[in-house]
Amino acid sequence: MKNKLKKKKNPKGTKKIKAKAKAHKVGTTKVKVKKKIYTIGTLHDLPSQIESYSDKESYSDKESYSDKESYSDKESYSDKESYSDKNILVKIFYEPEIRYLTPLEIETKPENKYCFFKKNNIKYIDFKNPSFLMKFLNERGEILPRRITGTSKKFQKKLKRAIKKCKHIGLLPYLTDGLR
C-alpha cells in the first residue's frame, strides 16, 4: 500500500484530500479506521502580479507592472476580493534565532523565602533601632509585605507594631522622598 495522499478537486472550489486509512493495533488484532477528509479551502489562482522571493533578489531587478499584461481580460476572482494595480512583493522571511518583540523565556527557580527572625532566633523586635527596621521599609517609607520579606505572619505583625512605634516616637519618618 502506498502512503501517498489522494487529491480530488471539488466542484465548489474547495480542495479535499483523502488520507490513507490507518490501522491501529489493539491487542493482537488490527482495527481499521475510516478515512479522514481534510478540507483545505477555496482554490483560486493567484494573480501573477504577486511574486514570492525566497532568495535575496532586489525589487528593481523584476519587471514593472506596465510590462505585464493587464488583468481586465481575466475573470474576476470574487466580488469580495480586490487586487490593487500596484505590484505586491511577498517575501518569505523567518529567522527563529532573532526575537525582538517577545521576551526571552528564562526559567528561574524562585528563591526559598525564610523568616529572618526564626532563623536568627530573635524573639523581640526592638523598636528603638531604626537602622534595623529600615531593612523592612521601601524607599517611600512603607512596610514591605510578607511575600517580599519572607517573614512569618507572627513576626510580620510584631514588625508592623515596632515600625509604627518607631515612627510615632520620631526615629523613622512617616513620608520620605528617598529613605535609602
From Swiss-Prot:
Keywords, comma-separated and alphabetical: Ribonucleoprotein, Ribosomal protein, RNA-binding, rRNA-binding
Keyword RNA-binding: yes
GO MF entries: small ribosomal subunit rRNA binding; structural constituent of ribosome
GO cellular component: cytosolic small ribosomal subunit
Entry superkingdom: Bacteria
Pfam families: Ribosomal_S18
Family: Belongs to the bacterial ribosomal protein bS18 family.
Biological role: Binds as a heterodimer with protein bS6 to the central domain of the 16S rRNA, where it helps stabilize the platform of the 30S subunit.
Assembly description: Part of the 30S ribosomal subunit. Forms a tight heterodimer with protein bS6.
Protein name: Small ribosomal subunit protein bS18
